[in-house]
Amino acid sequence: MAETLREHDTYDLYRRGVELLEDASFSEATVPLAEAARRAPEKSSVREALGRAYFRNRQFAEAAAEFEAVVETHPVNDFAQFCLGRALSLSGERERARHHLALAANLRPDREDYRLYRDRLRAAS
Protein backbone atom coordinates (compact mmCIF):
# COMPACT_ATOMS: atom_id res chain seq x y z
CA MET A 1 0.00 0.00 0.00
CA ALA A 2 2.76 2.48 0.93
CA GLU A 3 4.64 1.69 -2.31
CA THR A 4 1.49 2.32 -4.39
CA LEU A 5 0.94 5.63 -2.60
CA ARG A 6 4.56 6.63 -3.22
CA GLU A 7 4.26 5.77 -6.92
CA HIS A 8 1.06 7.82 -7.11
CA ASP A 9 2.73 10.78 -5.39
CA THR A 10 5.70 10.51 -7.74
CA TYR A 11 3.40 10.46 -10.76
CA ASP A 12 1.58 13.54 -9.43
CA LEU A 13 4.93 15.33 -9.09
CA TYR A 14 5.83 14.32 -12.64
CA ARG A 15 2.48 15.52 -14.04
CA ARG A 16 2.76 18.83 -12.17
CA GLY A 17 6.26 19.34 -13.51
CA VAL A 18 5.18 18.58 -17.07
CA GLU A 19 2.27 21.01 -16.75
CA LEU A 20 4.66 23.74 -15.60
CA LEU A 21 7.03 22.85 -18.42
CA GLU A 22 4.20 23.13 -20.95
CA ASP A 23 3.25 26.51 -19.43
CA ALA A 24 6.84 27.70 -19.99
CA SER A 25 7.46 27.90 -16.24
CA PHE A 26 10.81 26.19 -16.62
CA SER A 27 12.42 27.11 -13.32
CA GLU A 28 9.30 26.17 -11.39
CA ALA A 29 9.05 22.87 -13.28
CA THR A 30 12.44 21.76 -12.02
CA VAL A 31 11.18 21.57 -8.42
CA PRO A 32 8.55 18.80 -8.73
CA LEU A 33 10.49 17.06 -11.49
CA ALA A 34 13.69 16.94 -9.44
CA GLU A 35 11.76 15.45 -6.54
CA ALA A 36 10.13 12.89 -8.84
CA ALA A 37 13.58 11.99 -10.24
CA ARG A 38 14.95 11.63 -6.71
CA ARG A 39 12.12 9.24 -5.85
CA ALA A 40 12.23 7.29 -9.11
CA PRO A 41 15.65 7.71 -10.76
CA GLU A 42 14.98 4.75 -13.05
CA LYS A 43 12.04 6.49 -14.78
CA SER A 44 13.38 7.82 -18.07
CA SER A 45 10.24 9.89 -18.71
CA VAL A 46 10.85 11.81 -15.48
CA ARG A 47 14.56 12.28 -16.23
CA GLU A 48 13.82 13.44 -19.78
CA ALA A 49 11.23 15.97 -18.59
CA LEU A 50 13.65 17.25 -15.94
CA GLY A 51 16.35 17.54 -18.59
CA ARG A 52 13.99 19.57 -20.77
CA ALA A 53 13.16 21.88 -17.86
CA TYR A 54 16.84 22.41 -17.03
CA PHE A 55 17.64 22.99 -20.71
CA ARG A 56 14.90 25.57 -21.16
CA ASN A 57 16.08 27.23 -17.94
CA ARG A 58 19.59 27.42 -19.47
CA GLN A 59 21.04 25.01 -16.90
CA PHE A 60 22.90 23.06 -19.55
CA ALA A 61 25.21 20.98 -17.35
CA GLU A 62 22.25 19.81 -15.27
CA ALA A 63 20.27 19.08 -18.43
CA ALA A 64 23.16 17.06 -19.84
CA ALA A 65 23.31 14.95 -16.68
CA GLU A 66 19.61 14.09 -16.96
CA PHE A 67 19.75 13.26 -20.68
CA GLU A 68 22.88 11.20 -20.07
CA ALA A 69 20.98 9.14 -17.50
CA VAL A 70 18.30 8.49 -20.13
CA VAL A 71 20.71 7.43 -22.90
CA GLU A 72 22.59 5.13 -20.51
CA THR A 73 19.49 2.96 -20.23
CA HIS A 74 17.89 3.82 -23.59
CA PRO A 75 20.74 4.40 -26.08
CA VAL A 76 18.38 4.40 -29.08
CA ASN A 77 16.27 7.25 -27.69
CA ASP A 78 17.01 9.69 -30.50
CA PHE A 79 15.43 12.67 -28.72
CA ALA A 80 17.52 12.13 -25.58
CA GLN A 81 20.66 11.72 -27.70
CA PHE A 82 19.84 14.97 -29.51
CA CYS A 83 19.10 16.88 -26.31
CA LEU A 84 22.25 15.53 -24.68
CA GLY A 85 24.27 16.72 -27.67
CA ARG A 86 22.70 20.18 -27.55
CA ALA A 87 23.19 20.51 -23.79
CA LEU A 88 26.82 19.40 -24.03
CA SER A 89 27.45 21.81 -26.88
CA LEU A 90 25.96 24.73 -24.98
CA SER A 91 27.96 23.86 -21.86
CA GLY A 92 31.20 23.89 -23.88
CA GLU A 93 31.71 20.13 -24.28
CA ARG A 94 31.72 20.18 -28.07
CA GLU A 95 33.69 16.99 -28.63
CA ARG A 96 31.25 14.92 -26.58
CA ALA A 97 28.36 16.80 -28.16
CA ARG A 98 29.42 15.80 -31.69
CA HIS A 99 29.11 12.12 -30.81
CA HIS A 100 25.55 12.42 -29.47
CA LEU A 101 24.33 14.72 -32.24
CA ALA A 102 25.72 12.29 -34.83
CA LEU A 103 23.99 9.38 -33.09
CA ALA A 104 20.68 11.23 -33.04
CA ALA A 105 20.97 12.11 -36.74
CA ASN A 106 21.84 8.51 -37.61
CA LEU A 107 18.99 7.12 -35.53
CA ARG A 108 16.50 9.45 -37.22
CA PRO A 109 17.80 10.51 -40.64
CA ASP A 110 14.35 11.97 -41.37
CA ARG A 111 14.86 14.66 -38.70
CA GLU A 112 16.25 17.70 -40.48
CA ASP A 113 16.80 19.53 -37.18
CA TYR A 114 19.06 16.74 -35.93
CA ARG A 115 21.14 16.91 -39.11
CA LEU A 116 21.27 20.71 -38.97
CA TYR A 117 22.73 20.85 -35.44
CA ARG A 118 25.12 17.98 -36.19
CA ASP A 119 26.38 19.74 -39.31
CA ARG A 120 26.68 23.14 -37.60
CA LEU A 121 28.82 21.65 -34.87
CA ARG A 122 30.99 19.84 -37.41
CA ALA A 123 31.50 23.08 -39.35
CA ALA A 124 32.43 24.98 -36.18
CA SER A 125 35.43 22.75 -35.51
Report residues per predicted region.
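Terminal, low-structured helical/coil segments at or just beyond the last alpha-helical repeat
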Residues: M1-R6, T10, R98-S125
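Alpha-helical segment of the N-proximal tetratricopeptide repeat
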Residues: E7-R39
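Structural signature of tandem alpha-helical TPR/SEL1-like repeats
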Residues: D23-E35, N57-A69, S91-L103
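Short, charge-rich amphipathic alpha-helical segments embedded
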Residues: E35-A53
